[in-house]
UniProtKB/Swiss-Prot annotation:
Transmembrane segments: none annotated. Keywords: ATP synthesis, Cell membrane, CF(1), Hydrogen ion transport, Ion transport, Membrane, Transport. CDD domains: F1-ATPase_gamma. This is ATP synthase gamma chain. It is found in: Cell membrane. One of its GO terms (molecular function) is ATP binding. GO terms for biological process: proton motive force-driven plasma membrane ATP synthesis. F-type ATPases have 2 components, CF(1) - the catalytic core - and CF(0) - the membrane proton channel. CF(1) has five subunits: alpha(3), beta(3), gamma(1), delta(1), epsilon(1). CF(0) has three main subunits: a, b and c. Produces ATP from ADP in the presence of a proton gradient across the membrane. The gamma chain is believed to be important in regulating ATPase activity and the flow of protons through the CF(0) complex. The keyword Metal-binding does not apply. Belongs to the ATPase gamma chain family. The keyword 4Fe-4S does not apply. One of its GO terms (cellular component) is plasma membrane.
Length: 289
C-alpha cells in the first residue's frame, strides 16, 4: 500500500492535471461555439448553392449516364482526408482513419488535411500512399485556404490520374454525437443532395434544362465549383466536431481526475486515521504499564 507521502504527492499531481483539463475544456468550448457560428452563417449560402448545382446535376443524370471517367480508364482514386493537427480529441482521428482504410485500395493516393493521421497510416503500411500533407491551424481555416487545397486537387485531376475524388470528414450530429463520413466530389454524386433539397429543386427549377454551350463544358465546371464549396464546408464541420470531441474528452478527463482524487483522499484519510489510532493505542498501552 502506498504511504501517506506518496498519496499526498499523487493528489497534488492530480490537482494540477485537473486544472489543465478544465482549462482545455473551457478553451475547446469557446472555439466550438466560434466554429458553430461560422458553420451557421454559411448554411444559407450552401442551401442556395446546392439547389442550383443540384438542379443541373440531377437533371443531367436523369437524361445522360455519367461519362466523366478519365480517358486513361484509371481505377485509382484520390482521397482528401480531414483530420486534426493536435491530439486529445477522443476517437475523432481513429474513426476517420478506420473509414479511410476500409475504403482504400492499393493504388489510391491520399492528401491529408491535418497531420495527426500520419502515424495511424504509417502503422498500417499506407504511408507511401500519402502524396501531400497540409498543416492547418484555427487561424487559416477560411475559404481561401480551402480554395488553395481544392486548386491543388483539381490540378492533379487535370492530369487524368483519378477515377474519382473522395473526401473523408466528420459529420456533426450534435455536441455528443458525430460520425466519420465519405463524400464523392468528382464525379459529383447526386446522393449528396438530401431529400428536402431535391424537393425544393423540383419546385423551383424546370425538369428539363437546356445546356449551353454544352454538358461537356458545364458539368465539369460546376463539379469544380462544387468541390471547392463542399471542401470548405467539410473543413468547418470537421472543426466543429474536433472541438466538440476535445471538449467531451477533457470533460471526461476532469471527472476522472475528480474521482481519482477522491479515491486517494479517502485512502489518505484512512491511513492518517489508522496512524492516529495506533499512536493513541501506544500512548494508552504505555500509560498502563
Amino acid at each position: 500500500m502506498a504511504s501517506m507521502q506518496d498519496l499526498k504527492r499523487r493528489m497534488e499531481s492530480i490537482t494540477v492535471t485537473h486544472k489543465i483539463t478544465k482549462a482545455m475544456k473551457m478553451l475547446s468550448t469557446v472555439k466550438l461555439n466560434r466554429f458553430k457560428a461560422t458553420l451557421g452563417k454559411t448554411k444559407e449560402f450552401y442551401q442556395e448553392f446546392y439547389e442550383v448545382i443540384g438542379a443541373v446535376i440531377t437533371n443531367y443524370n436523369k437524361t445522360k449516364p455519367r461519362t466523366t471517367t478519365p480517358t486513361n480508364q484509371s481505377t485509382k482514386r484520390l482521397w482528401i482526408v480531414i483530420n486534426t493537427q493536435l491530439g486529445l480529441c477522443g476517437s475523432y482521428n481513429t474513426n476517420v482513419g478506420k473509414l479511410l482504410v476500409s475504403e482504400l485500395a492499393k493504388d489510391d493516393e491520399i492528401i491529408l488535411v491535418g497531420t495527426k493521421l500520419n502515424s495511424f497510416l504509417r502503422t498500417r503500411n499506407h504511408e507511401d500512399q500519402i502524396i501531400h500533407t497540409y498543416s492547418i491551424n484555427d487561424k487559416n481555416i477560411d475559404f481561401e485556404s480551402s480554395y488553395m487545397i481544392g486548386k491543388h486537387v483539381l490540378e492533379l485531376h487535370e492530369k487524368n490520374q483519378y477515377d474519382s475524388i473522395d473526401c473523408v470528414y466528420t459529420n456533426y450530429i450534435n455536441s455528443l454525437n458525430f460520425e466519420a463520413k465519405k463524400i464523392q466530389l468528382i464525379p459529383a454524386d447526386p446522393s449528396i443532395f438530401q431529400a428536402d433539397t431535391l424537393d425544393r429543386i423540383n419546385d423551383k427549377f424546370p425538369k428539363n434544362i437546356s445546356f449551353e454551350p454544352g454538358v461537356d463544358v458545364i458539368i465539369p465546371a460546376l463539379e469544380k465549383q462544387l468541390l471547392q464549396v463542399i471542401l470548405y464546408g467539410c473543413l468547418i464541420e470537421s472543426k466543429v466536431c474536433e472541438y466538440a470531441s476535445r471538449r467531451n474528452a477533457m470533460d471526461t478527463a476532469a471527472k476522472n481526475a475528480d474521482d481519482l482524487y477522491n479515491k486517494y483522499k479517502l485512502l489518505y484519510n484512512q491511513l492518517r486515521q489508522a496512524k492516529i489510532t495506533q499512536e493513541i493505542n501506544e500512548i494508552v498501552a504505555g500509560a498502563a504499564k
